């Protein structure tokens, strides 16, 4: 029976990497389980590359890309792909943007034709642009009807003092309204150049024929001068912060952050392990303590946000607002226990198994595997770092988790956000509560 390590080593060994003369990086994985393909063209530019006045332009470009090129009408793009049994989609993150086509293997050539055209020769029709701006603005308004979205947008703004992750990917109404066709073309010309892109193909395809098609559609794409972006150093907060959003909701929502790691940092896998131990399901420490033992929360979970830039460790859930103060106290005590006493071998081994199992499971489909390869290539610079991640998880020790928890779980850098019908306490009470913590080793 194959071990998880063997599975990942086999996966990495089968990837073919090639760089075209124009600088485009190509990753191909021969996915032989089914006659399917995922073709993903990713650009290393996300919302964090925008200036304040450009907030939302990356996302708006993503919306506009499928709206027609110099030679193709909108119906010649999505409609053609769907007629061949496939589908198209795209997403914008803080760090990169991806456009993809998925479907039967027979769709590959058409996917190359369409993606190379829409990404390099979009028309950005002014009438269509005005219509799409309204769609995006409506999307903004709908998002703010979601309590967690509202909570996290405010939390990100408070958690980052300088780094552009503090802005929502979708942008702001005033910036989106201001964009003209020339603005989109200018931004695209600064970043949409082959050496700033990765083409990922995962499918049941013959290698020689595939690279011949890639050369046909991508080798002559124009080189553009890549704009250099300098990112600010993030200072994070030096004192506990509190944001309270008052809305007529039936239950209370909470979300906390502490400084985290970049995915390029050696500590990132250890924070994933800590997240699994603290908030990964009903056997996690926070669930057992705050839900099962004390019944303070309705739901609770954690996640480690490890992007290209500085990350965050996040704890969030729902609860009766009357319990908010006690929730902060109990969460911080659980974090302090790990700093003082670590975790058990059983907890660590269970977290390792869960993370690697989820990691492998998410890479079993052609689309999932293209996402895995893409994220490692774009954030860490090489898809082969899948093996770095696997090794870091497998060899992590209790001492590693104690060291990392001491480094990142500083309650003085806690940012707390609540959403409820009314405010229950001020930031001074939060600071007093943190000052009075008395953790006891478990």
Language-model features: where?
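Short beta-turn/strand-loop junction motif enriched in small, turn-promoting residues
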Residues: 25, 46, 86, 261-262
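His/Glu-based metal-binding/catalytic segments typifying zinc-dependent metallopeptidases
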Residues: 31, 40-42, 226-285, 392, ...
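Active/ligand-binding-proximal structured segments within catalytic/core domains
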Residues: 23, 32-81, 256, 266-278, ...
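Charge-rich, well-structured scaffold segments of protease-associated domains
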Residues: 19, 76-226, 233, 244, ...
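N- or domain-start disorder-to-order transition segments that initiate the globular core
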Residues: 3-36
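Short acidic/glycine-enriched loop/turn segments that link adjacent beta-strands
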Residues: 12, 35, 95-96, 250, ...
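Short beta-strand micro-motifs in enzyme catalytic cores
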Residues: 16, 25, 252-256, 311-313, ...
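Residues that act as N-cap/strand-start positions at coil-to-secondary-structure junctions
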Residues: 10-12, 239, 400
């Amino acid at each position: 029976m194959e071990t998880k390590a063997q599975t990942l080593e086999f996966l990495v060994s089968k990837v073919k990497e090639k760089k075209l003369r124009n600088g485009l990086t190509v990753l191909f994985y021969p996915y032989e389980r089914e006659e399917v393909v995922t073709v993903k063209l990713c650009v290393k530019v996300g919302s964090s590359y925008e200036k304040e006045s450009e907030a939302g332009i990356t996302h708006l470009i993503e919306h506009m890309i499928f709206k027609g090129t110099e030679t193709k009408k909108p119906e010649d793009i999505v409609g053609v792909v769907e007629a061949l049994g496939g589908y198209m989609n795209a997403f914008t993150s803080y760090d990169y943007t991806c456009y993809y086509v998925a479907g039967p293997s027979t769709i590959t050539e058409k996917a190359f034709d369409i993606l190379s055209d829409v990404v390099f020769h979009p028309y950005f029709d002014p009438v269509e642009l005005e219509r799409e701006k309204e769609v995006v603005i409506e999307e903004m308004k709908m998002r703010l009807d979601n309590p967690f979205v509202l909570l996290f947008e405010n939390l990100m703004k408070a958690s980052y003092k300088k780094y552009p992750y503090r802005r929502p990917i979708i942008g702001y109404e005033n910036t989106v309204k201001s964009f003209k066709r020339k603005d989109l073309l200018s931004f695209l010309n600064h970043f949409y150049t082959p050496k700033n892109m990765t083409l990922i193909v995962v499918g049941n395809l013959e290698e020689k024929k595939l690279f011949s098609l890639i050369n046909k559609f991508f080798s002559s794409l124009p080189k553009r001068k890549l704009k250099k972006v300098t990112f600010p150093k993030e200072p994070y907060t030096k004192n506990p912060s509190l944001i309270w959003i008052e809305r007529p909701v039936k239950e209370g929502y909470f979300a906390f952050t502490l400084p985290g790691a970049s995915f390029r940092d050696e500590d990132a896998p250890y924070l994933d392990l800590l997240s699994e131990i603290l908030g990964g399901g009903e056997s996690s420490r926070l669930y057992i303590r705050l839900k099962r033992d004390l019944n303070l929360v309705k739901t609770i979970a954690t996640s480690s946000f490890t992007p290209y830039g500085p990350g965050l460790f996040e704890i969030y859930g729902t609860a009766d607002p009357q319990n908010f103060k006690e929730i902060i106290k109990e969460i911080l005590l659980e974090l302090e226990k790990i700093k003082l006493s670590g975790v058990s071998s059983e907890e660590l081994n269970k977290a390792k198994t869960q993370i690697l199992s989820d990691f492998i499971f998410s890479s079993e489909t052609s689309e999932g595997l293209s996402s895995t390869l893409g994220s490692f290539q774009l954030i860490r610079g090489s898809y082969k770092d899948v093996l770095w991640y696997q090794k870091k998880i497998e060899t992590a020790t209790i001492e590693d988790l104690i060291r990392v928890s001491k480094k990142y779980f500083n309650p003085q850098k806690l940012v707390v956000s609540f959403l409820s019908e009314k405010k229950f306490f001020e930031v001074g009470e939060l600071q007093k509560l943190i000052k009075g913590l008395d953790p006891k080793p478990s």
